[in-house]
Amino acid sequence: MADYLVKSLIDGGMFRAYVVDATETVAEAQQRHDTWSAATAALGRTLIGTMLLSTSLLKGDEKLTVKVNGHGPVGAIVVDGNANGTVKGYLQYPHTSLPLNEKHKIDVKKAVGVNGMLTVTKDQGLGQPYTGQVPLVSGELGEDFTYYLAKSEQIPSAVGVSVFVQPNNTVKVAGGFLIQVMPGASDEAIARLEQRIKEMPMVSELLLAGQTPEEILALLFKEEKIKIVQKMPVGFKCDCSKDRFAQSLASIQPAALQEMIDEDHGAEAVCHFCGTKYQFSEDDLRAILTEAQAK
């Protein structure tokens, strides 16, 4: 089934809740970057977290970039997201696999590391982008997104992100939730929610059991009134193109372009975000060089 995200209001606005099935999104990222298990889980969780952040914080054409660097074995993780729920992302070391942790699960904390920062840069089309940064408090990423929302956005929240990776490195399921506590929420309602989150299995386990985002919402808010505000398709989508890379090539020194023509007889550009390769022939490079010199 195609990935989708559900936005909802709980009890007339005590909470805003977002639940997403992002299985195909994370599976596509795994295939594009050939990630191994620990890298798949780390990148997947960051993709899901970014999707939840961008669909809850942004509107219109606004976009954001999440960077996670805990100086762990997977290196830096970079994910772009927008209000429409599409994401793209990559990490530094895709071929990272680690022994399972004491709970017999992928050791995301060790893969990501905790000696570093989570940085969110929001481009709201107002000129200078806004950047918020917090230290990594967990490395498991759900808690780190929660900490970011509390400290940088002043929104008390709960974030859960999880990915189930099969022994052959493919993604079986992936998903997550984000719950924002609104000013009208009672202490009793907050305590009840905290207890439910504590008792609830990971989202990936619920998806494995065939639960939908709507059913996961109902598990989180058993007694409360749920109003579904929007059900939106989400996915992995990259906006790279050969033209964009041609523009980048046009900005480098003419001598360097001439060298590519004379010595390499062409060039290959690879998109970090999606792995797509673009070939530029000698004629392509000559045309770019001629155009650049004419400016």
UniProtKB/Swiss-Prot annotation:
Keywords: Chaperone, Cytoplasm, Disulfide bond, Redox-active center, Zinc. GO terms for biological process: protein refolding. InterPro entries: Heat_shock_Hsp33, Heat_shock_Hsp33_C, Heat_shock_Hsp33_N. It holds the Pfam family HSP33. GO terms for molecular function: protein folding chaperone; unfolded protein binding. It comes from the Bacteria. Disulfide bonds join 238-240, 271-274. CDD domains: Hsp33. Under oxidizing conditions two disulfide bonds are formed involving the reactive cysteines. Under reducing conditions zinc is bound to the reactive cysteines and the protein is inactive. GO terms for cellular component: cytoplasm. It is found in: Cytoplasm. Its main location: cytoplasm. Belongs to the HSP33 family. Redox regulated molecular chaperone. Protects both thermally unfolding and oxidatively damaged proteins from irreversible aggregation. Plays an important role in the bacterial defense system toward oxidative stress. HAMAP family: HslO. This is 33 kDa chaperonin. It comes from Levilactobacillus brevis (strain ATCC 367 / BCRC 12310 / CIP 105137 / JCM 1170 / LMG 11437 / NCIMB 947 / NCTC 947) (Lactobacillus brevis). The gene is hslO.
